[in-house]
A protein has these predicted regions:
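Extended basic (Lys/Arg/His-rich) segments that typically form rRNA-contacting surfaces
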Residues: 2-224
Length: 224
């Protein structure tokens, strides 16, 4: 259920249910100092309220997973199917984000339970998945790292991709040939990322190094 301010009212306790991962939004980058005084570059992630919206089982759905939902929608933006599916989780009018984490079913998990930020702890090694920044249409030099031609005055080409054909046989462009095209805006996964700090009161998670995507990008963290 949601109150007059649009904030979610959860039915679970303060701790919530712990899963093998969670979802958070990228806020930006910063740096913190380690125990030995070293400066550690970190990405700041903010976790909102996520509620369990469905428990998928291998017998019924073909695989085990916990479906989660967050950020309530307005009634005008929701379909009847969405309202019916998420009503049991406490969303009267659907949710902007509906995601899932594949894992074994935790004991005692119920619809409407809040996901605990303690699902991820300091020192954990996680797999980070998010949507990379979209760069628009890009040439082969920027998109694939082609060397390009000489930068001399006498050169007739500089950043052109060059010949893409072949000989008489096969007489066609082979599948997978690298061409100019849309760069970015694709799902990227970074593995072996260390969790530097977790601040439960603020809903903040600090992970070492950069995370793909722009600010406010939804990020999935799963324990390795």
């Amino acid at each position: 259920m949601s109150d007059s301010n649009g904030e979610m009212q959860t039915t679970a306790g303060a701790e919530g249910v712990k899963l093998n991962g969670l979802f958070a939004h990228k806020m930006g980058m910063s740096s913190v100092y380690g125990d030995n005084g070293e400066s550690i570059p970190v990405t700041v992630l903010k976790m909102e309220t996520w509620l369990v919206s469905q428990v998928k089982t291998k017998e019924k759905d073909g695989y085990s997973a916990i479906q989660l939902a967050s950020r309530p929608k307005k009634a005008v933006n929701s379909s009847q199917a969405e309202k019916g599916h998420l009503k049991a989780a406490g969303f009267e009018n659907g949710a902007h984000f509906v995601k899932e984490i594949r894992q074994a079913i935790p004991e005692g998990v119920q619809l409407g339970q809040r996901v605990a930020i303690g699902s991820i702890a300091k020192g954990d090694i996680v797999r980070v998945t998010s949507r990379s920044k979209g760069k628009g249409f890009a040439g082969s030099v920027k998109r694939h790292g082609f060397a390009g031609g000489p930068a001399a005055h006498g050169s007739k080409f500089h950043r052109q991709p060059g010949s893409s054909g072949n000989r008489t046989w096969p007489g066609r462009v082979m599948p997978g040939k690298r061409f100019p095209g849309h760069l970015g805006a694709e799902t990227v996964t970074v593995r072996n990322v260390r969790v530097v700090e977790v601040l439960p009161a603020e809903g903040i998670i600090l992970v070492k190094g950069p995370v793909p995507g722009a600010r406010n990008t939804l990020v999935k963290l799963v324990k390795e």
